[in-house]
Amino acid sequence: MKKNIGKITQIISAVVDVKFTNKGKLPQILNALECYNDKQRIVLEIAQHIGDDTVRCIAMNSTEGLVRGMEVVDTGSPISIPVGIETLGRIMNVVGEPIDGKGKIKGSSISSIYKSAPSFTQQSTDRNILVTGIKVVDLLAPYTKGGKIGLFGGAGVGKTVLIMELINNVAKAHGGYTVFAGVGERTREGNDLYHEMIDSGVINLEEPEKSKVALVYGQMNEPPGARARVALTGLTVAESFRDMNEGQDVLFFVDNIFRFTQAGSEVSALLGRIPSAVGYQPTLATDMGELQERITSTKHGSITSVQAIYVPADDLTDPAPATSFAHLDATIVLSRQIAELGIYPAVDPLDSTSQVLDPMIVGEEHYNVARKVQQILQTYKSLQDIIAILGMDELSEEDKLTVSRARKIQRFLSQPFHVAEVFTGAEGKFVNLADTIAGFKGLTEGKYDDLPEAAFYMVGTIEEALEKAKTLK
């Protein structure tokens, strides 16, 4: 078959125009084009048709060294990547090339990164809780198996550490596979995560097929085209795991979904589209919907997705985080004020929500304890202005007791993480759901009113808090 060959006519940053001289043979939108620059394969994705013979493309690699007149070949299909068992333990980029120095990904099947979401009849609506072993999450914003969870937070409040702890806890306690998509984040963090996974046995270098995770990276230094598509590459790998062998439960981590939106905004501006609110692309909701609607559970298997969402300037009303809210089953909001108190994970217990915190799903006891904890913390929050102006002495005895319990609850919501052992020196703790509920039930009922606040800080179960209290007296 004769190849459809074009020539580069214009290069502006990550946007490349290609002219095809074969009349009537203009490649389709989203097709991948290939050209070679000093033996390096460069992939271009068609975004627009301009006139009768020219296509405008977004580059997936750096355009340095490209010149006008270079030959470009139409591959005849969208970007396609290797999927299946062979991707386990490997790191690949947006176009499916291995970037871990371990050679080609052999024997795997190939799949396009563009697919339609499963139909209504294929989707599953069962609701089961996924226990994470993190107290504040399991109690106040429980995760659903096959649900979508958003981690919202500004810069430096602990989104990536929380994601790494979830990978550690859930991937070990849970038999399924994990896919991690690094979208526009720090290369150093991606490298650290890879080596931690090797150390913890999640990645097996000797026998890669025994690994539990596949990694897909498009980090901060990549062009906007790569960052805008790498989440789709990761999702395609996750879908292949979900649909194989009569179904699997898959965990899909994205760090960071905001960078997906940000890259889309850069691409949109380069293509000359008129921006919408706050300078974002006019297709913001569509882009987000196309990604999120594919992250779903079918009757065969499930994809449980955890997405870190950077909040620009800590403003939750910014269009990028606000657009993702609509797609999520649970939202975990990380608060700078709580991080400043030294309480980690810095989850805001009043802002974080979950659709499954419902007595019909989690049970009456869990629901009542969670609501009581939130009620005590809300009362404490409303009393803080009075305390700041008049001091504790002006409060009624009942309010003083509420404040005392709230401060203990606040500290008991902290927990030492396995992945943070290296820099805290404290052994990480996985807390079962029953222990979490029992501990907070005792606190709300006043069973531990006589213990010092410090006993509840950075412990796992309530038994550990009681032991710690003995050493403090």
Curated annotation (Swiss-Prot):
The protein, known as: ATP synthase subunit beta
Pfam (any one): ATP-synt_VA_C
PROSITE patterns given in the database record: ATPASE_ALPHA_BETA
Gene Ontology molecular-function annotations: ATP binding; ATP hydrolysis activity; proton-transporting ATP synthase activity, rotational mechanism
Keywords: ATP synthesis, ATP-binding, Cell inner membrane, Cell membrane, CF(1), Hydrogen ion transport, Ion transport, Membrane, Nucleotide-binding, Translocase, Transport
The species this protein was found in: Rickettsia bellii (strain OSU 85-389)
Cited function: Produces ATP from ADP in the presence of a proton gradient across the membrane. The catalytic sites are hosted primarily by the beta subunits.
Family according to the record: Belongs to the ATPase alpha/beta chains family.
SUPFAM superfamilies assigned: C-terminal domain of alpha and beta subunits of F1 ATP synthase, N-terminal domain of alpha and beta subunits of F1 ATP synthase, P-loop containing nucleoside triphosphate hydrolases
Catalytic reactions of this protein: ATP + H2O + 4 H(+)(in) = ADP + phosphate + 5 H(+)(out)
